[in-house]
């Protein structure tokens, strides 16, 4: 199915218009230690948090995919007999099930096509774009300029007494369910692991405006939205016989407000090679370590 997607680079350009400069630092990332994980065919499905946009080395410009993202690190550590990383920046659940267009406008088949009957491990990290992640960040960053101490973003998304973002999470639930059920049909014997999302904002307090341009009173609100999304993913995984890998907890204290040498997720102006508000190489390493630990538990 060819359809318009929310191009990550368009969203990044919108955010970058708020910034005065950018900086990039190439990280050296160590491969995680070996773990007792499935060593057969491994297929990685997901969005930009999986693909690793702008993290060197980019091996697929249509999907902005790095060969140092967490699936690549896990596959190397596990010694997977074959490996297919079909994650793609901007992907939604529809892209997994039906296909869509990449960042360069090149049409892609369904990510699900990579899952074969002999697949032994499938990882899935999806849902952020189903709720409109890039648009939310852009809206909230722009709104913060006029009310940095207030809650302009929360006010917008809860106007009329209905939390639109919680409603989006609820609407995404059956879509994630459909993905997991399709994966199970395609690979009945595979171990399926659903990953949540790492901390973008501090786990406590009111953030670090203007370094991360989210208004102070909006930080607790958006933090709660991310936790609700992760909780939904955990619940759907459990209900469909999949394992949930928590990457939020190990990322606490490594959010976008932290120093460039500590953070897993970049802010508006990346100080490490990564897209704005996306994991850097350290974040991909951290998610790989968390995934391996979960597989070995």
Residue ranges of model-derived segments:
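Oxyanion-hole/transition-state-stabilizing segment in secreted/luminal serine hydrolases
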Residues: 53-55, 105-167, 199
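Short amphipathic alpha-helices and their capping/turn segments at secondary-structure boundaries
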Residues: 31-41, 106-123, 176-191, 292
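Secretory targeting and sorting signals
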Residues: 1-35
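Charged, often glycine-rich, active-site loop that binds/positions anionic groups
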Residues: 90-109, 256-271
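Serine-esterase "nucleophile elbow" of acetyl-processing enzymes
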Residues: 35-90, 141-147
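Conserved N-terminal glycine/acidic-rich loop preference
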Residues: 121-124, 147-184, 193, 197-244
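Structural recognition of the beta-strand scaffold that forms the well-ordered cores
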Residues: 41-46, 50-51, 82-87, 120-125, ...
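Catalytic His-Asp segment of secreted/periplasmic serine-dependent ester chemistry enzymes
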Residues: 198-297
């Amino acid at each position: 199915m060819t359809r318009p997607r929310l191009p990550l680079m368009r969203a990044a350009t919108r955010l970058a218009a708020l910034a005065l400069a950018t900086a990039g630092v190439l990280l050296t990332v160590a491969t995680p230690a070996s773990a007792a994980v499935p060593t057969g065919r491994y297929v990685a499905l997901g969005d930009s948090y999986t693909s690793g946009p702008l993290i060197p080395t980019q091996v697929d410009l249509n999907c902005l995919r790095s060969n140092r993202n967490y699936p690549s690190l896990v596959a190397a550590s596990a010694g997977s007999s074959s490996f297919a990383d079909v994650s793609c920046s901007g992907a939604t659940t529809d892209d997994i099930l039906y296909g869509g267009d990449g960042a360069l406008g090149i049409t892609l088949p369904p990510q699900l096509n990579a899952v074969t009957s002999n697949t032994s491990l499938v990882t899935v990290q999806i849902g952020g774009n189903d709720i409109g992640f890039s648009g939310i960040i852009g809206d909230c960053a722009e709104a913060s300029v006029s009310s940095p101490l207030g809650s302009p973003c929360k006010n917008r998304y809860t106007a009329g007494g209905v939390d639109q973002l919680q409603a989006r999470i609820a609407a995404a639930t059956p879509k994630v369910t459909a993905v997991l059920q399709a994966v199970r049909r395609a690979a009945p014997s595979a171990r399926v692991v659903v990953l949540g999302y790492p901390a973008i904002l501090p786990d406590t307090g009111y953030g670090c405006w203007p370094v991360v341009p989210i208004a102070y009173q909006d930080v607790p609100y958006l933090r709660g939205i991310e936790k609700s999304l992760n909780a939904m993913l955990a619940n759907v995984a459990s209900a469909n016989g999949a394992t949930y890998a928590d990457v939020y907890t190990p990322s606490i204290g490594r959010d976008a407000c932290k120093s460039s040498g500590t953070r897993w997720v970049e802010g508006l102006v990346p100080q490490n090679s990564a897209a704005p508000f996306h994991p850097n190489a350290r974040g991909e390493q951290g998610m790989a370590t968390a995934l391996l630990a979960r597989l070995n538990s």
